Amino acid sequence: AAEYGHKYNLSYETLDSIICQGKELGIHFYIFSGGEPLVRKRDIIRLCCSHQDCYFFAFTNGTLVDDELCREMKEVGNFSLAFSIEGDSEVTDFRRGKGTYQKVIEAMNRMRKHQLIFGYSACYHRYNTENVISDRFVDDMVERGCRYAWYFTYIPIGKQARTDLLATTEQRALMFKRINEIRATKPLFAVDFWNDGEYAHGCIAG
């Protein structure tokens, strides 16, 4: 995280080679993650076209989602987005900047208009855990068209990381309980990246 801003981008050819090698090993699902993967949306769509036997997924802040991208996503049919959101407008903008929540909602509306599958990604910390797992928030995300959800606990990384944002032991226990309730009662496929490790016999990343 301390290296954000440095230009360490993989070329399209390298990305394509990684996927080709992965397929030889039986891997057909690929995730793109931060900074902001959609700064490479042209290359991602190109990869989707070239590897129709694979499915691609990206975490995004939604600011680069436009109608053209939505049309391309619908055409390739093997690319989905999870929008980073941390609860209601107040708690989302608290850590991600003023106006971020509204931009995410606008991107969700655009995706729904184009009848695309999408979800949300929530980083839970000391000041938003109860908000981001509340019925009010989850139901709102479902109504906006989300079909899946990723939950990540805040981990302080980098030179100026805030340790005061770490979720408490009680909040992590609450998340374990609530994620199972959400899966049982909501039309939403929800995953807690940390607490659900038991289902993958270890790290969910693979």
Placement of each model-derived feature along the sequence:
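Radical SAM/AdoMet-radical enzyme domain recognition
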Residues: 12-32, 40-153
